UniProtKB/Swiss-Prot annotation:
Disruption phenotype: Accumulation of ADO3 protein during the morning period but no effect on flowering time. FMN binds covalently to cysteine after exposure to blue light and is reversed in the dark. Weakly expressed in seedlings, root tips, stems, leaves, flowers, young siliques, sepals and seeds. Keywords: Biological rhythms, Chromophore, Cytoplasm, Flavoprotein, Flowering, FMN, Kelch repeat, Nucleus, Photoreceptor protein, Receptor, Repeat, Sensory transduction, Ubl conjugation pathway. NCBIfam families: sensory_box (TIGR00229). PROSITE patterns: PAS. This is Adagio protein 2. GO terms for molecular function: photoreceptor activity. Belongs to the ADAGIO family. Self-associates. Interacts (via Kelch repeats) with AD03, CDF1, CDF2 and CDF3. Interacts with GI, ADO1, SKP1A/ASK1, SKP1B/ASK2, SKP1C/ASK3, SKP1D/ASK4, SKP1E/ASK5, SKP1K/ASK11, SKP1N/ASK14, SKP1TA/ASK20A, SKP1TB/ASK20B, APRR1, APRR5, DI19 and COL1. Component of an E3 ubiquitin ligase complex that plays a central role in blue light-dependent circadian cycles. Acts as a blue light photoreceptor, due to the presence of FMN, that mediates light-regulated protein degradation of critical clock components by targeting them to the proteasome complex. The SCF(ADO2) E3 ubiquitin ligase complex is involved in the regulation of circadian clock-dependent processes including the transition to flowering time, hypocotyl elongation, cotyledons and leaf movement rhythms. APRR1/TOC1 and APRR5 seem to be substrates of the SCF(ADO2) complex. It comes from the Eukaryota. Residues 35-114 form the PAS domain. The lineage of its organism: Eukaryota, Viridiplantae, Streptophyta, Embryophyta, Tracheophyta.
């Protein structure tokens, strides 16, 4: 049986009594975290559905926001392809020359290949005034066939002087409009009383095939379209699918294990991770001791446990002991782990987590110089013991390099300092899942300047981001704030510079102050958080900076949060615990490692700890 569409005119977009004090629909108990004040003012979101089974993808539905912002009534656009928005005025036949043809071609290619498109394009209202349309087109499949395309459109004013728009007489516009409307089938002349094909689908199909494919921000906007979609977007299971598709299965699994996650619900989790409204610093103390005292060790998180290995002791003595801090305990304290066959002592090395409870250490500076060996430790083994991995064709020995893990099985190492003192620019990969692991240098047509003290961060499925470090510039070395990315899913991966397109940073800066030995972590959705490290001048090392490399035009922004941050934070002493807590060890003096004091950055309300 066909479902009568509940049209926007019956939906109260003002929210009425259901609008919470913070301006979000429903507050903590509601389901649509969408700021009412921005609709349709500063950030109006249009919603368009086209029929992929008909030639030229004709529009079959637009929401009220689309009508208000563009000036086109629904009955004027139903049955047309949405490319008319690229023409200045309702009667112009050609695309305006200022519309980026490259973006148009990319969008056409995505539609033809049935893949998702994201981009920003110059569009025009009915009166000819320009506006920027940041849109996302998502193909909807049923039994492996694309049936519809869903478009979520974020409109903003375009500050472009195009001169007077082509005008028509006041009598001409209604006459042509009536002529166009009369050519439509009677059932399509008034969408508010007609039937929309998408609403003939069952709730299950809409939720699983359509809503679950959107981002948290998009689904929040979709919930404002009509009553039926409003009710569907209140379902916590729908939001879980949205978060899983956006953030990945592993991130979703980690969030599910956070204490209180079930109580708080996916709606609020999605909102807090998107807006960072609940992000806050907290200082806490732990028991136990790490003796002998040391610096330049490496820390890594395994679930709720923080592991430190090695470090530089008195008189530059390399250390090779292992300590664990269990933050899941009611009274966390540092404990020494008795392990057999420990690696040679070292500092300036990296310690990373691979599958489950396994840790991998690489390189560093030891008693007899630089190292390039690899050791694995299973923290949950009984008893735990280190095991050397004799990887074939290893990279040259190094220290102060950067590393990360991919897919839980692959170790990636980049840069660092060689025995000669020269800085390195190579990138190597070691697959630890192989029976006989072998190092492989990733061949690239171009490499960023050689550096040490930088960070490698994994985001998306198989992408890595490099930031900062002490980089070589001619015969000199300078702190860097450059950003480079590499997609390892490509047949021929290559480093690509990320250029900042403006920002909200003070003083008109396009990037955070240059630094090395800083902290860089990947947040759900692929955003990168940067802070800490060695920063020159009067710039604060504790200021948080956020970058989304997935954006078409990435731009840095400052993240201001509650609570008192640490004065210092170093990359080798900071780690993400449980996916929702960023723990900084020490951080008050920058020299003495007071490991009984720590700071944590809580990324969501439910992560508040009792320690």
């Amino acid at each position: 049986m066909q479902n009568q569409m509940e049209w926007d005119s019956d939906s109260d977009l003002s929210g009425g009594d259901e609008v919470a004090e913070d301006g979000w629909f429903g507050g903590d108990n509601g389901a649509i975290p969408f700021p009412v004040g921005s609709l349709p003012g500063t950030a109006p979101c249009g919603f368009v559905v086209s029929d992929a089974l008909e030639p030229d993808n004709p529009i079959i539905y637009v929401n009220t926001v689309f009508e208000i912002v563009t000036g086109y009534r629904a009955e004027e656009v139903i049955g047309r392809n949405c490319r008319f928005l690229q023409c200045r005025g309702p009667f112009t036949k050609r695309r305006h020359p200022m519309v980026d043809s490259t973006i148009v071609a990319k969008m056409r290619q995505c539609l033809e290949n049935g893949i998702e498109f994201q981009g920003e394009l110059l569009n025009f209202r009915k009166d000819g005034s320009p506006l920027m349309n940041k849109l996302r087109l998502v193909p909807i499949r049923e039994e492996d066939e694309i049936t519809h395309f869903i478009g979520v459109l974020l409109f903003t004013d375009a500050k472009i002087d195009l001169g007077p728009s082509p005008d028509l007489s006041a009598k001409e516009i209604p006459r042509i409009s009536r002529s166009f409307t009369s050519a439509l089938p009677i059932g399509e002349r008034n969408v508010s009383r007609g039937l929309c094909g998408i609403f003939e689908l069952s709730d299950e199909v809409i939720a699983i095939k359509i809503l679950s494919q959107l981002t948290p921000g998009d689904i929040a906007s979709v919930g404002c379209v009509c009553r039926r979609l409003n009710e569907l977007t209140k379902n916590d299971d729908v939001w879980r699918m949205v978060c899983q598709n956006t953030w990945g299965t592993e991130a979703t699994r980690v969030l599910e294990s956070v204490p209180g996650a079930k109580r708080i619900g996916w709606v609020r989790l999605a909102r807090e991770f998107t807006t960072h409204e609940a992000t806050a610093w907290r200082k806490f103390s732990v028991g136990g001791t790490v003796e002998p005292s040391r610096c330049n060790f490496s820390a890594c998180a395994v679930g709720n446990r923080i592991v430190i290995f090695g470090g530089e002791g008195v008189n530059m003595q390399p250390m090779n002991d292992t300590f664990v801090l269990d933050l899941g305990s009611s009274s966390p304290e540092w404990k020494s782990v008795l392990v057999s066959s420990p690696p040679p002592g070292r500092w300036g090395h990296t310690l990373s987590c691979v599958n489950g409870s396994r840790l991998v250490v690489f390189g560093g500076y030891g008693s007899h110089g630089l190292l390039n060996d690899v050791f694995l430790l299973d923290l949950d083994a009984d008893p735990p013991s280190w095991r050397e991995v004799s990887g074939l064709a290893p990279p040259i020995p190094r220290s102060w390099h950067s590393s990360c893990t991919l897919d839980g099985t692959k170790l990636i190492v980049s840069g660092g300092c060689a025995d000669s003192g020269a800085l390195l620019s190579d990138t190597f990969l070691l697959d630890l899942s192989m029976d006989i692991p072998a190092w492989r240098e990733i061949p690239v047509p171009w490499t960023p300047p050689s550096r040490l003290g930088h960070t490698l961060t994994v985001y998306g499925d198989r992408k890595i981001l490099m930031f900062g470090g002490l980089a070589k510039n001619g015969t000199l070395r300078f702190r860097s704030n450059d950003v480079y990315t590499m997609d390892l899913s490509e047949d021929e991966p290559s480093w690509r510079p990320v250029i900042g397109y403006g920002s909200s940073l003070p003083g008109g800066m396009a990037a955070p102050p240059p630094r090395l030995d800083h902290v860089a972590i990947s947040l759900p959705g692929g955003r990168i958080l940067i802070f800490g490290g060695s920063v020159a001048g009067l710039d604060s090392a504790s200021q948080l900076y956020l970058l989304d490399p997935n954006e078409e035009k990435p731009a840095w922004r400052i993240l201001n949060v509650q609570g008192g941050p640490p004065r210092f934070a170093w990359g080798h002493t900071t780690c993400v615990v449980g996916g929702t807590r960023l723990v900084v060890l020490g951080g008050q003096t920058g020299e003495e490692w007071m490991l009984n004091e720590a700071h944590e950055l809580l990324l969501a309300t439910s992560t508040t700890a009792s320690t």
